[in-house]
Each structure stands twice: as C-alpha cells, then as structure tokens.
Amino acid sequence: MIELKKYNSKNSSYQFHVKILSDIELSSNSEQAQRETIFIKDICNRVLKSSTVVYTLQNEGQTLGFIALSVSSIDSFPSLQVDYLFVSSQYRGVILEELEDTKTSIYLIEFAIEIAKEMQEKVGLRYLVLLPDDERLQKVYRDIGFAKFSKKDWMFFKL
C-alpha cells in the first residue's frame, strides 16, 4: 500500500537523518553516495529548524524516496521550492504499477504540484520551483511542464 509520511519540526528528532538514511538505499557510486548523505543530513537539519518539510513515499513499509519542500521567493514571486528529491537507488528509473505506472520521481513531483495548487488557493503562490542537478534532469522536468527562468539554472512550474 502506497503511503506518504510527512515529517516536520513537530514530529522529528535530532536523529531524523539516521532514520532517513537507514530507510533508503544510496547510490552504489561511493562519491555520489557521500554527496547524497551530505544533502540528506542538510535537509534533515532544515526540517528540525522548521524551514523544510519532508514527505517520504513508502510502499509496504519500504521507502521508495522522499521530497523536501519549503517556501521561497524567486524573482519576487512567492513559490513552493523543491529543496531535494531523492529516490532510493533500487527504484531509480523504475516504473511502478503501485504508483499508477509511473516512476517514483515523477510521482513525487506530481505530489508537490498538487500541494502547491492547494497552497495557491489559500495564500498567494505563483510557482513550484527547483534547481535540477544536471541537464538530463532538466529534460525530465521540461517534459512535466517546467520551464527555465531566464539567465538562471532554476526551473519553474507555473500554477
């Protein structure tokens, strides 16, 4: 059964990163795994400081990945920002029937878009924004409907 669990400063402890790291599978490339660990620890610290919320995606108790979200402003436009999107290495690029025949990463981005749309109805919000790690990911996000800000590496999804 698919489940999204929300973690914020109210329900997370200083050992939050230990739980997240024990629930996921990092890259088999040691340099990439080290980079992922650094990002995950940083995101977990942001959760404890109330600046980020993390949603883990689980299937039958197995963590498929997570998305970290925060509120920001890009070029003076209020935005929901994807701070980090992580997919456990064994699920990267894998289409899952349990996720309505989509990849974990796409499922999490679509979830973030829905949250942004819900927020837009309650407060002024214009975009969902993210900073892709590389050009390959830029194409993935363009296919979903994201566009690049002019003169910046950031991408946005207009709500």
Task: Give the ranges of each region predicted by the language model.
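Non-catalytic substrate-recognition and accessory regions of acyl/acetyltransferase enzymes
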Residues: 1-102, 106-159
